[in-house]
Amino acid sequence: MNEIKTLTFYSNYFNHHQKALCDEFYKILGDGFKFIETMPMEGFRASMGWGENTPDYVLRTYESGKNASIADKLAVSSDLVIMGTAPEDYCEERLKEGKLTFRYSERPLKEGFIKFFIPRLTKKYIRMHIKNRNKNIYVLCASAFTALDFKKMFNSYPDKCYKFGYFPVHKEYDLNELMDKKKKEGCVTILWLGRMLKLKRPDLVVSAAKNLKDSGYDFKLHMVGEGEMRPVLEDMVKRLGLEDRVTFEDFLSPDKARERMSEYMIYVMTSNKLEGWGSVIYEGLNASCAVVASHICGATPYLIKDKENGLIFKSGDVKSLTNKLKMLLDNNELIEKYGRNAYETMHSKWNPENAAKSVLRLAEGLIKAGSDGFNVKYPDKEYIIEDGPCSKAGYLKNNWYKDGK
């Protein structure tokens, strides 16, 4: 072990989705870990609390020439580099020297092939992915659909993709106390939380609420967030006569959003395929909610085992979503069962501590096996991870989920 003494993570900016994972890297490696932030955060993300509490291990290249020079040197000298959304120049010399590199990527084709045929982007994709297919670079997949997307791109990263994601802080709970807290309303409580954008499809849960009310179910739906669809949703609620069932709340900071999740029994995630990952699924599972998630979100196939720790519905299908919610409303014991199993999934495997250790274990296994990207595709057997972060990523099609099976 301990093949990895230095790890440098390059990305455009540092945010709360990355902090917990990076904190774990720092606990293990100390000053051997650095996060390189290559650009200032956009105003709207900063206003959402993304840029708060920046740790000492973060180095901002845009603040000084000295910082930029350090980042350039670390790109070559580090035992392991993780490339997020950052200039490709950082890994080019490194790959020429055959040094191990992990690319941290959501699915590249979530909008289809259209961008691949824009000349500027075609050139970029060839440089980043196709030219490097046989170099010492592997993919940490921040979507269950990433591996197949890269395969479609002229078989980039052949058999070199591993499950990963984004890892917000894992919160520890006393499950008995948490379950009691969720039952205080006296009826089943459902939460939808996020930016109210078209790609998030919040209208689906409002339509499902109408179906549930018409079927005589007792429940409350709380919707948290702001965005272009907020007025549309408020109008839907009035038009459908749901004012007694549906309430709204404005945007919450990340910490307050997590607290709100802990108060609700069911969490619904409705986004379409433009949702690269969907960290709210992670957060809902951690909060011991019975999560009902769209099948096409990047996190869903990795985190949710249908009818074990949550439920999956067919993306965009109100009937499918309604039926899954009815399953839970018909059986409150099922809500608690899925909630407890959800927490255990996150507590045992899908958490920042395990993810950081798994990255280092995978990297050490590849180095031990003499990986050069061309001749070696698998880590040594003792380093292989069977399930969870850094286990092998399979190929998953958009239409993988068959409702009712």
PLM features per residue range, with description:
Residues 41, 145-146, 163-177, 228:
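Short beta-strand->alpha-helix junction loop in the catalytic core
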Residues 245, 320, 327, 334-349, ...:
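A short, well-ordered alpha-helix in the C-terminal region of glycosyltransferases
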Residues 232-252:
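Nucleotide-activated donor-binding/catalytic signature segment of Leloir-type glycosyltransferases, i.e.
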Residues 296-307, 311-312:
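Short acidic/histidine- and often glycine-rich active-site loop of Leloir-type glycosyltransferases
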